[in-house]
């Protein structure tokens, strides 16, 4: 499933995006952000993050640097720490 989503983004970036004017207000671009989000979080959460990002990409938003959020890691508590 992840491969399909990434493939669709690749097709967009390779064949559709070059035909349109560069209007993305963010770095990385919205399509690159969505691609990175899918790689990090999987197809469903990554696509959701991409949709949220694209919804902010309009003239009333200032744009700027907006990277994919880091994935939170769960730390295991070391039970031997106080011994």
UniProtKB/Swiss-Prot annotation:
Its main location: membrane. NCBIfam families: membrane protein insertion efficiency factor YidD. This is Putative membrane protein insertion efficiency factor. InterPro entries: Membr_insert_effic_factor_YidD (IPR002696). It is found in: Cell membrane. It holds the Pfam family YidD. Could be involved in insertion of integral membrane proteins into the membrane. Belongs to the UPF0161 family. It is a peripheral membrane protein. The keyword Cytoplasm does not apply. Keywords: Cell membrane, Membrane. The keyword Metal-binding does not apply. One of its GO terms (cellular component) is plasma membrane.
């Amino acid at each position: 499933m992840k491969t399909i989503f990434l493939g669709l983004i690749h097709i967009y970036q390779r064949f559709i995006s070059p035909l349109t004017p560069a209007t993305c207000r963010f770095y990385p671009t919205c399509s690159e952000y969505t691609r990175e989000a899918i790689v990090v979080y999987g197809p469903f959460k990554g696509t959701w993050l991409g949709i949220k990002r694209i919804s902010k990409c309009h003239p009333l938003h200032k744009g700027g640097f907006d990277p994919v959020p880091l994935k939170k890691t769960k730390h295991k508590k070391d039970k031997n720490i106080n011994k």
